[in-house]
């Protein structure tokens, strides 16, 4: 049995997602892990795929989640992820509270709970400020970097860095799928609302 910790960003996924991979083989059979194709600086390889390169071509979300994709392709990743389709679905904005609607505009790209004014800070936020830990919470994505690891709650701002880098909202299901490298032709089926996000957050980038 061989094992290694791999970062999805090193293989062209627009997400810094470290996971341990195990390969089991019969005796006498040599196995090896693939060499990284991308890197942070991109000196001897391709540069990490950024959030902007992954989702910037998507129009604003709609009520039914179906959107037309215009010819505004900004990257090779977008051309590939579209899978030759001119529309996609499940591009719906998750609901957020009135307090969160006030909080989100206060957080700049790369910012987090530390940018939230005291007048909007809940007891939890005040405690986070006091401890100074878990700096991805209430985070807004940077457009020129891969996202942080998507979790099963990437539809919430209180758990992780899930705020769109430009628009004042959380990530849509489709944006989450793109950051996991699922093509636009792929759709998620679930019997519960949260189940959609659980499936994508738990997935291994294909």
List where the protein language model places each region.
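Class I S-adenosyl-L-methionine
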Residues: 1-127
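C-terminal target-recognition/interaction regions appended to catalytic cores
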Residues: 75-206
